[in-house]
Amino acid sequence: MFELDAQRLAERIDTVLDILVAGDTHSAIHNLEILKAELLSKVKDNAQSGTPKSPWEI
């Protein structure tokens, strides 16, 4: 499984929350879409890396 930097993720979420508090919902949604795409890309890259799966992941 890929390494997830929880601190970095929390900072990104905090930024989105700050944007929402400021009232710019369009930018907040855009930032969430970017974050989602980055996370899905990491998952896809991990799946293609050929790392053997644990029995419960098959």
Swiss-Prot record:
It holds the Pfam family YciZ. It comes from the Bacteria. Belongs to the UPF0509 family. It comes from Escherichia fergusonii (strain ATCC 35469 / DSM 13698 / CCUG 18766 / IAM 14443 / JCM 21226 / LMG 7866 / NBRC 102419 / NCTC 12128 / CDC 0568-73). This is UPF0509 protein YciZ. The gene is yciZ. InterPro entries: UPF0509.
